[in-house]
Amino acid sequence: AVLPDSPAEPLPIAARLVKLRAMRGLMMDSPLLISSLLRHAARVYADQTLVSRTVEGPIHRTSYRELHERSQRLAQALLALGVRPGDRVATLAWNGYRHVETYFAVSGIGAVCHTLNPRLFFDQLLYILQHAEDVLLLVDLTFLPLAEKLAPRCPGLRGVVVMTDRAHLPEHALPGLHVYEELLAAQPGGYAWPSFDEHTASSLCYTSGTTGDPKGVLYTHRSTVLHSFAISLPDVFSLSERETVLPVVPMFHVNAWGLPYAAALTGTRLVLPGARLDGESLYRLFEDERVTMTAGVPTVWMGLLAYLKQTGQRFTTLKRVVIGGSAAPEAMIRAFQDDYGVEVLHAWGMTETSPLGTACRLTPAMQTWPEDQQLAVQRKQGRPVFGVELRIVDDEGRELPHDGAAAGDLQVRGPWIASGYYKLDGSNAHHDGWFSTGDVSTIDPLGYMQITDRSKDVIKSGGEWISSIALENLAVGVPGIAEAAVIAAAHPKWTERPLLLLVKAPGAEVDARAVLDHIAQHVARWWVPDAAVFVDGLPHTATGKISKLQLRERFKDYRLPDTE
């Protein structure tokens, strides 16, 4: 804005802000709260349906009106259990209607909804629960055995709620266990959602701990509502009450990429797949519920495409598939678009970006380009959505040109980008107000970003991160192993799998199987490397670090045993 008395030389930002504050607009100061999304859905889209494949088995159908009423009862139940504003309430659950109710009820009372990723190994989950100081844990039936192991080791946990009814409750070893449906039935309903500062913490997700302990990212009501608006835009997910969306991405993965919130905002019909994510189960749900859009990681789509190829089935209603979590292979894009007539939307984000940062849609001019040129664009992660700014910088922090050739550290900022980590002061991931993603990227003149490498050498297998450092540390803990390095090897299904490279100590007698068995005792099964190879030595940089760059080049054509 230019003020009438502006000097010839621009004022410093602080001085300009002081002048701009001299005149305030006359708009109501209504806070952007997550409860307002659900209240809006219940009033405007009351009869829109939400469909869930439940853990118990049957398909469950509800409406936004009923979802709102049950969320109000859950809010009252949480308060009756002693949950207070600011408390963290954890979930271990699949995509289902009770999990959606928990999203809205926990945040709606001013507490923090903390989704736990059950695919992490036990020690990580225990660390996260203890670090977050969760006061309550809500679990699907699937994860009740896991909760029985975790709860006794978390003294701050006041109780566990099983998200089922009494008829489906199995035998268990947890004292004072609460049954979800009984908690709701005991409440009168009609809860009035409180109003509070929109900057209040609303939800908490932890990173996968690829460079050490997992780190907590604490979202706010404001950031969540703004993110919901952004992902609903026509050139992003294009959500409306005319769409039926099935989020395959789990609700424990950065809030299912924000889709449950955005669906309430736009009245989108939501279909939730539960625990069954195989190709046949997903296809049947797509067809039975006439799904028009879906979102998930490449590994899931590989299984779905394989099922379609084997059976000759085709989609009758699916129009768009969002692929994120890791890069979409060109063959996958071609298969969806050429073989099945489904548009592919390539997207990028991370836990720290809520998660959506970019979406890749072709411009009108690109629609006339040759197919190969269009695919070259679609392989990119796309352009930033409104609210997100991107830049790339060199090692000295100098901004690099957006010419599609210069590659540098990708940095991002915006209203739903993390400014720090929960209980972690002095994060070195932020530079002059920008968050460093750890990705090496290019940005072309049209604003399309493409990730070319990952600076921290993590392995992304089926959309899940695996820490090379953690595996290396375990390997060198085996007697007789002098040095170890883990790099990514290409895999046709999982995109990447860990390959373990080992150097024996002089005179040592140790076999690869013993090393892998040792690792398997300490990490989740899917973290265990697919192969271990002994080498005479590992290359090092001038500073004494193992050169992963040289190792990747040396083993770029390596074929894992089960992919021969």
What residues fall within each predicted segment?
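Conserved adenylate-forming
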Residues: 78-84, 187-200, 204-246, 258, ...
